[in-house]
Amino acid sequence: SGKLNIDEGKSYQQRNLSMQALLNYDRTFGIHTVSGMLMANRDELTISGHNLPYFNVGMGGRFTYAYDQRYIGEFTFGYNGSENYPSGRRFGFFPAGSIGWIATNEGFLKDNKVLTFLKLRASYGLTGNFDIGGTRYMFDQYYDWGGYYPFGDANSNVETYFEGTLANPSVTWEKERQLNVGFDATLFRKLDISFDFFNRDRRDILATPYRTIPDFVGFKKPEMNVGKVNNKGFELTARYADRINDFNYYVQGGVWYAHNEVKYNAEMLQQYSYMYRTGHRVDQPFGLQAIGFFKDQKDIDDSP
């Protein structure tokens, strides 16, 4: 007789292989400061029981130039690829740029006793999202199985196969354009103030195109890069720090505001305008609002 091993015949493995190469450069020439960075990466995730591993590759860079500790410019980029997308749409290029001006290093503000630090800054860039969830390889057509139907003289149940979600050979990266404008300031060397305004336009969001593909076509509709969402708002923070004898203290607070709106969602045509999700916030709940109960037949007859 042998011993029963509850784990016999059962195994699970997950291997994550990540490779990264990095090159940095930083040098100052008098009043000129130059720095740069280049990076390449490759990620592979293999899970037991899955025939196809997950692959992501990319490279990126950052280049910065500063003049006399007053003017700053920076350019960054990413060139990334994901196996989630078909050949020809697998890679995306995502650049960004920013500028800054430290006004208190100018001669007319250098020794100001009230405004001891002021930096104005702005940035604009494009980012991409490959973590889309759902089905992998939505650009490839596949078949599902399920259900049975009687076949033959014996009416034996035969398993059925049917066409799965329609392939989308044009699926690609979701993208976001980001604009940020703000400043950092210090008053009397004690009060720090930071302000940021942001405007983010998301495009090519994966959504089901109910408007362009009606239900009567007879197949399960694929997700397509049709959605558009806008997010904008501001953030204001302040921090006051001081010292009384040997006692250090600070007071900090902030105000935030953000608003998002669905600009386009390819939703089906509705009978009434209030039924559309477009123009409202993301994931906003919808429902009918009751105005009361009927009291009697006369109340029913008088209702609109």
Regions found by a protein language model. Name each.
Residues 299-304:
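Short, intrinsically disordered, charge-balanced linker/junction segments flanking boundaries
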